[in-house]
Amino acid sequence: MNGDFPESVWIMFQMTFAIITPALIVGAFVERIKFTAVMLFSGLWLIVVYCPVCYRVWGGGWLAEAGVIDFAGGIVVHATAGASALTLAWMLGRRSGFPRNLKPPHSPGMVMMGAGMLWVGWFGFNAGSAAAANGDA
């Protein structure tokens, strides 16, 4: 951080990473566990997996000192979420009734709106990671 914006803004930006990362994992166990279990898993996962990896990779951690470069969460967000989702999907097994009871998409317009929001949001993640809106972002 270069000091051009308040520390609270940086904290809120980092919280967006912490919030979205467990949401990436949820797709691996959708329709197989209860919502309360998802909330409990998300909190525990943030403490046990996400925070230690952030500490080691970002902000001058020992992996950063060893030369690991993680721009916009490639390791901290995507690798940890992907490995966790794969592990959970393997542990939970197949969904019951899938693929016999497929439901067609109900609103292509809403799908496009969601894709647009995701696109703009991820651009914000990249710009925020560079702490600038320039060619680095």
Which ranges hold each PLM region?
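Hydrophobic alpha-helical transmembrane bundles of multi-pass membrane proteins
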Residues: 1-137
